[in-house]
Regions:
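Short, solvent-exposed loop/turn segments at secondary-structure boundaries
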Residues: 113-118
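Conserved small/polar residues in nucleotide/adenosyl-binding loops
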Residues: 123-125
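Structured beta-strand-rich core segments of catalytic domains in phosphoester-bond hydrolases
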Residues: 37, 42-111
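A conditional alpha-helix N-cap/helix-loop micro-motif detector
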Residues: 12, 84, 119-120
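N-terminal, active-site-proximal structural segment of metallo-dependent hydrolase catalytic domains
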Residues: 1-47, 51, 57, 62
Length: 125
């Protein structure tokens, strides 16, 4: 299996550049993106042969993750049960018969580790 993970720093911006060409070139079984910065349904991707699982932040234009899979997932989780972090759309977890695939976009610690506690809270769930 081929897995690809890419922090796109805004899906709408990268769609104007080369996202679809890169997506096709990797020919991945599972393709995960982080920092989509869009609401669910705001961007429609035509990815024949792929199932799409999106998780968006409540705050518009902030964080967000998505997973595109050839095989349909048995179950999809959009978060890990922590209301504060789940509201930021940082997790898409897909269950398959033999494994779980977890796409996580961890919070930035910022300069001088000002937000390290926020970042670690995701790890300690």
């Amino acid at each position: 299996m081929r897995f690809v993970s890419w922090n796109v720093n805004g899906i709408r911006a990268v769609l104007k550049k080369n996202f679809l060409e890169v997506f096709d070139a990797f020919d991945a079984d599972i393709f995960a993106i982080q920092e989509t910065k869009c609401q669910v349904g705001q961007v429609e991707l035509d990815l024949p042969g792929y199932h799409q699982y999106w998780s968006a932040a409540e705050k518009k234009g902030y964080s967000g993750t998505a997973v595109f899979t050839r095989e349909e997932s048995l179950r999809v989780l959009h978060g890990l049960g922590n209301e504060y972090l789940d509201a930021e759309g940082r997790i898409v977890a897909c269950e398959f018969p033999q494994f779980w695939f977890v796409n996580a976009y961890t919070p930035n610690s910022q300069m001088e580790l000002a937000r390290i506690d926020h970042r670690l809270s995701l790890i300690h769930i």
